[in-house]
C-alpha cells in the first residue's frame, strides 16, 4: 500500500449525443443528464471545464446550457492548452484537479465533445 488518497471523487458521469450535423453540441445532453443524476444545478458547480477544440463549439454549449462567459475554462481549454487526440480526458483531469486544489473548489464539471455528435460530462467532488 502506498497510502495514497484520491484527490477527487467522481460523483456522476454521463454520455449523450446529438445529430452529427450539430456535433459540437454533443456535451449539452450529457451535462443535462449528469446534473439530473446528481440533483445539482450549474449554480452548484464551482469549476466548469468545457474542453473544445474550437471556440464555436464552446460558445454553442454555453448558450444551450445558459453558462455565463466568465465561468468556464478559467485556465483556458483545448484551444489554448492543446487538444491532443486521445489525451483530452487525462489533460482535463490533471489540470482541473490541480486548479480545484489551488482555488479550494469542492465541485467541478468536465465535458468533452466527441466526433459524430457524442458528448460526455462528469461531475467530481473534492
Where do the language-model regions lie?
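Claisen-condensing/thiolase-fold acyl-transfer catalytic domains that form or cleave C-C bonds
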Residues: 1-126
Amino acid at each position: 500500500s502506498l497510502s495514497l488518497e484520491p484527490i477527487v471523487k467522481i460523483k456522476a458521469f454521463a454520455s449523450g449525443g446529438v445529430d452529427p450535423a450539430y456535433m459540437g453540441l454533443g456535451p449539452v445532453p450529457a451535462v443535462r443528464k449528469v446534473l439530473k443524476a446528481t440533483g445539482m444545478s450549474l449554480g452548484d458547480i464551482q469549476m466548469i471545464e468545457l474542453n473544445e477544440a474550437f471556440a464555436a463549439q464552446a460558445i454553442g454549449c454555453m448558450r444551450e446550457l445558459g453558462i455565463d462567459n466568465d465561468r468556464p475554462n478559467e485556465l483556458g481549454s483545448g484551444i489554448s492548452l492543446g487538444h491532443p487526440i486521445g489525451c483530452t480526458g487525462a489533460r482535463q483531469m490533471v489540470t482541473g484537479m490541480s486548479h480545484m486544489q489551488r482555488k479550494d473548489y469542492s465541485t467541478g464539471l468536465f465535458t468533452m465533445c466527441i466526433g459524430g455528435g457524442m458528448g460526455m460530462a462528469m461531475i467530481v467532488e473534492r
